[in-house]
Every structure is written in structure tokens, then in C-alpha cells.
């Protein structure tokens, strides 16, 4: 899509929506041709639990406004801005020329701690390499909308969505493994063919690579599987940029002691991953007993999962122990 920059359109910088009166960015020249769009941008509703994936760290909202001009999009450069997400919401008021079609792009992430490169002017986000594993700062949300602006006030609600699959790994034999002399303190994962580029206006994920997270301290929250008589210790939690269609991939999981010198690695094939879905791999993963469960559930809402995939257990019986000097 060809894009040109529309410069000098705004007479003043945009103010975020507060209780005080807003200035008119364009003076009074437009008169009745002026419209105001009042946007309420929100994260999806999520329950309050100790599980990861509640979006609490996504406190910075970046957004850009584009004016449609035939097959072109004209960036309204002075309307590119940021807002603070409070309690999962941000309110924005923007005054624009009426009777014109606009597109908005949104991205919400962890302010100052985000592992993503955001080019909001070109509505593109890239996943940086070597992201630390098991960090909730890796969670983020995106959204877009089209507005045919009319004269007067145009209220709109926009709900952002997560472009990632959340991959969780948990084990029921954490303590017995520790008692045997291997105290797991850090983990990492490598995934074949995860995506690294997101178009905020289309939602398209591209540039797939074999992606590997670096070692990170194991998660501390509750493992997101309910209704089980067995308690699982969280070993790994990571966000992977995926498409809206379910894909299967190979996941290589490595756990290490505090020094990182004693490691154990295992691979799982045919693991299902899908945007905005949670995939759980759990069982007695560290001992000789072989019990593996894999579930995938939509929108992070169903803690029990809706799609069991027992074939994974049959495909993954090799367990490699490595001791590095």
C-alpha cells in the first residue's frame, strides 16, 4: 500500500482526554466540517487470578491516525501519540475534518520494558531477538478501526486483542526432581516457525523464523490448569506471535539450575499454537514416568482447555540430559 505523509495539518499537539476542556487542533476554519472522535481503547476483559496473561503490564498505548485517499493512506503525522492505559483503558479525543474516512492503529505494551520495536507511523511491530523467557513484560495488545467521521461527536469503543499465543509448561514432579539433586531455577524455549512482524492495520503476521528465548527465572504464578487433583509447578511461560489459524510446531524446552551449568532439554512436536489462545504442556515431565497432557484454549478464558491433543505424547519420548562444564 502506497503511503504519503500529510504534513502541517495540525496547528497544535493533540491532548489526551481528561476532565478539562480540549483545544481545537484546527482552529475554527472548518466550522461545520469539523468532527470529534472520542475513542475509548480497552484491553479485553480478563479475570483477576494469579495466572499470567492478565495484561497488567500493558500500560503504554501508542496510536496513529491515517486518512484514506483512494487506495492510499495519508499519515496524519502530528496525530501520532501515546497515552497511558489505566486499569486497562485509555480515553482519547481527536478533532478531525468531517466527512472523511480514517483508519486508526493501536499498540499497547509495557512502558520502558517492552521487547518490541514499534514503528507506529508505518503501523508495524517487530519482535526483537533474544527476548528473556518467562517475562510478563512480553505481553502486548494491538487493534485497529475505521471511522467515517461525521460532523459533531463520534464516540467509539475499541477493544484490543493479543496477537500472541501463550505457551505454558508445567510439571508435577518439581520437588522430587529437586530432591534428586537437580534444582530447576531457569528455563527457555525454542519454537520452530514463530512470526516476528505484525501489521497493525491488517493483523497479518509475517517473517517466520525459528525463535529462541534466552534463559529466564521460572514463573511464580499458578499454572493455568483447573480441575486437576495434581498440582503443577510453572516451569515456562512465553508469548509467541502467531496467526489467527491454528498451526502445529516443534517446541524445544530447556531447564537449568541457578548457575545455568546443569541443563536438561526436551522436544515436543505437533504442538498447537494459535493467536490469542493458550497452549498448556504439563505432566510428570522431569522423571522417568511418562505422562504428558497438552491442551489449547481460546482467549485465555477457559482454564481447562477445550482441545486435547494426545498425539503429542506419542511423538515425544526422547529426554536428553546434558551437563556442561
What is each stretch, according to the model?
Residues 20-325:
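Extracytoplasmic cysteine-anchoring/structural motifs
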Residues 1-7:
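Bacterial N-terminal signal peptides that target proteins for export
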Amino acid at each position: 500500500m502506497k503511503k504519503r505523509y500529510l504534513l502541517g495539518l495540525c496547528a497544535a499537539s493533540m491532548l489526551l482526554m481528561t476532565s478539562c476542556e480540549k483545544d481545537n487542533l484546527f482552529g475554527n476554519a472548518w466550522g461545520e466540517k469539523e468532527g470529534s472522535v472520542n475513542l475509548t481503547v480497552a484491553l479485553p476483559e480478563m479475570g483477576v487470578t494469579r495466572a499470567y496473561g492478565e495484561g497488567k503490564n500493558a500500560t503504554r498505548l501508542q496510536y496513529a491516525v491515517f486518512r484514506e485517499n483512494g487506495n492510499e493512506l495519508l499519515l496524519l503525522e502530528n496525530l501520532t501519540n501515546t497515552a497511558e492505559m489505566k486499569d486497562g483503558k485509555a480515553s482519547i479525543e481527536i478533532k478531525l475534518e468531517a466527512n472523511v474516512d480514517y483508519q486508526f492503529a493501536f499498540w499497547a505494551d509495557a512502558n520502558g520494558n517492552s521487547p518490541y520495536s514499534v514503528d507506529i507511523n508505518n503501523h508495524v511491530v517487530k519482535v526483537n531477538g533474544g527476548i528473556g523467557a518467562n517475562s510478563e513484560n512480553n505481553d502486548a495488545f494491538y487493534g485497529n478501526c475505521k471511522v467515517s467521521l461525521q460532523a459533531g461527536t463520534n464516540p467509539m469503543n475499541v477493544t484490543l486483542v493479543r496477537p500472541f499465543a501463550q505457551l505454558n509448561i508445567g510439571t508435577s514432579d518439581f520437588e522430587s526432581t529437586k530432591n534428586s539433586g537437580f534444582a530447576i531455577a531457569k528455563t527457555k524455549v525454542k519454537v520452530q516457525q514463530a512470526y516476528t512482524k505484525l501489521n497493525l492495520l491488517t493483523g497479518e503476521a509475517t517473517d517466520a523464523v525459528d525463535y529462541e528465548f534466552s534463559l529466564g527465572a521460572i514463573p511464580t504464578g499458578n499454572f493455568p490448569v483447573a480441575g486437576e487433583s495434581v498440582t503443577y509447578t510453572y516451569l515456562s511461560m512465553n508469548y509467541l506471535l502467531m496467526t489467527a489459524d491454528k498451526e502445529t510446531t516443534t517446541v524445544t524446552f530447556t531447564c537449568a539450575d541457578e548457575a545455568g551449568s546443569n541443563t536438561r532439554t526436551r522436544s515436543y512436536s505437533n504442538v498447537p499454537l494459535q493467536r490469542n489462545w493458550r497452549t498448556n504442556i504439563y505432566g510428570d515431565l522431569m522423571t522417568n514416568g511418562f505422562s504428558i497432557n497438552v491442551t489449547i484454549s481460546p482467549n485465555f478464558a477457559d482454564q481447562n482447555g477445550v482441545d486435547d491433543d494426545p498425539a503429542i505424547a506419542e511423538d515425544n519420548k526422547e529426554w536428553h540430559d546434558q551437563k556442561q562444564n
